[in-house]
Amino acid sequence: MPKLRSATSTEGRNMAGARALWRATGVKDNDFGKPIIAIANSFTQFVPGHVHLKDMGSLVAGAIEEAGGIAKEFNTIAVDDGIAMGHGGMLYSLPSRELIADSVEYMVNAHCADALVCISNCDKITPGMLMAALRLNIPVVFVSGGPMEAGKTKLSDKLIKLDLVDAMVAAADSSVSDEDSAKIERSACPTCGSCSGMFTANSMNCLTEALGLSLPGNGSMLATHADRRELFLEAGRRVMALTKRYYEKDDASALPRNIASFKAFENAMALDIAMGGSSNTVLHLLAAAQEADVAFTMDDIDRMSRQVPHLCKVAPSTAKYHMEDVHRAGGVMGILGELDRAGLLHTDVPHVAADAGGNLKSVLAKYDVMQTQDDNVKQFFMAGPAGIPTTKAFSQDCRWPSLDDDRREGCIRSREFAFSQEGGLAVLSGNLADNGCIVKTAGVDESNLTFTGSARVYESQDDAVAGILGGEVVAGDVVVIRYEGPKGGPGMQEMLYPTSYLKSRGLGKACALITDGRFSGGTSGLSIGHVSPEAAAGGTIALIENGDRIEIDIPKRSIKLAVSDAELAARRETMLARGPMAWKPLSRQRYVSMALKAYAMLATSADKGAVRDRSKLED
């Protein structure tokens, strides 16, 4: 029978000092011997997705203590990618994922906690905590802050739905008046919560449901809705149930590495492809798989992208649906139910929402709105927006008049009526990306599935933005932004501003954009990222010259630089002749801090999840 990890610091005469300190935190005589559950909270006033999380740890703690545990809360950092976007702050976003993972590991192992609840929400916080949870392999439940309500405003007497990207595009569009731009800005982000579309934060919170590590509704229930309170309470109760199963019954199925197996990663990727999730999810799933020692790779993603249909279309891929609409249609469980009926889901895998001995099949039987007989579940998925600006969690209890169970023309479709029979993400490869690259096909217009154009090369995102706004980029160009990968940036910046500015200039369907950086979940259009190897690691993207022809064929999963092998070999020799300046941008002026240099020293390319290169850390 496994011994409580916390016994290391609570048992024996030699631990008198440690017990004295535990007592100073409120632990009583009769508490010693109970499991100590760590609560990793990511509350911060910097981030709308986290601004309402201050008291959530106390909610979870109350449920843990009522179930017989000791709850101890700590905090992690949280970067807002939207606020960090478009300037040097974005260099810190992806590296913060590793810091979050490390900090959770440090706190949990330093204090010998027995189990963990992760309160996360936004872009790098959920992935960082996920990496830590799989690294630690102690009982864990994830519960996020939930999505924000979609913005709404009237323009030209027409009510429209909005999100963050709309504000960015409108601000850069000279045809939009100052008055309308300000109106959109003030309406785009009305409440607390993660941005309202299927951007990275919401994508990752949905994927934790599919991995089996969070409760039904975690990814889609609005941050403002009163029903979300129960998710926090149940997270506390569930982590205690998992803790007892492992430590008292020696049930290893309660551990995250046994829940998040290869099959579970396939389920998560199937969901991601079906819902057209952010391309960043590929990066984070690959990183999490490495922490779990699961051999899930880009090859698996490529294989699945050819098999799984696109069943759910959400902003930024459409203006019609946001996360509140996904929830009304049954949330993640609704999409998983359709994947199951299509024969594309493993249902024989454990799940934190299942009782001992149960699995995803039993969870779907209760929570898939197309098969459940539970009226409470149906009411749960009818939770809707109030349309009242607020930073308070659980501040409203509005409900839709009915569920969206239209699987032919609704937000979630059956396989027969899928938005497309191939999924919302694709892996492309060719001589421009030997180890692959990613495109969010859910956001690509059918007319752009094949594209050939002339390269317009930039050595940084800043130069690309200046070029787009300055009129250098014209219809038919393929904008190439390089040296923005994990090493080259360093930090692998998101390219939301370049793609937004292409749209605002009327070039959204007339140009393509290729980068060894990455894209915001808010990106749509022919935007191809994660080019691997990156420029700084000797990738072919570093050898592209202005005017080179680039051929993109998404149906064939191909991306090709139409330059002969002999010419590429000559360019590579020229690059190597630069000595210490090889594989570096010649003209870019960018301050890189010691912290970012340390990150870059160990960072791998995107095809490995941009995690640390373990080979450099082995004895």
Curated annotation (Swiss-Prot):
Binding, [2Fe-2S] cluster: C122, C195
Protein's UniProt keywords contain ATP-binding: no
Cofactor: record remark: Binds 1 [2Fe-2S] cluster per subunit. This cluster acts as a Lewis acid cofactor.
Enzyme class: lyase
Catalytic residues (positions): S520 (proton acceptor)
Keyword Flavoprotein: no
Gene3D superfamilies xrefs: IlvD/EDD C-terminal domain-like
Positions that bind Mg(2+): D81, D123, K124, E494
Chain positions found as N6-carboxylysine: K124
Any single Gene Ontology cellular-component annotation: cytosol
Example of a GO MF term: dihydroxy-acid dehydratase activity
The family this protein is said to belong to: Belongs to the IlvD/Edd family.
Role, per record: Functions in the biosynthesis of branched-chain amino acids. Catalyzes the dehydration of (2R,3R)-2,3-dihydroxy-3-methylpentanoate (2,3-dihydroxy-3-methylvalerate) into 2-oxo-3-methylpentanoate (2-oxo-3-methylvalerate) and of (2R)-2,3-dihydroxy-3-methylbutanoate (2,3-dihydroxyisovalerate) into 2-oxo-3-methylbutanoate (2-oxoisovalerate), the penultimate precursor to L-isoleucine and L-valine, respectively.
Protein name per UniProt: Dihydroxy-acid dehydratase
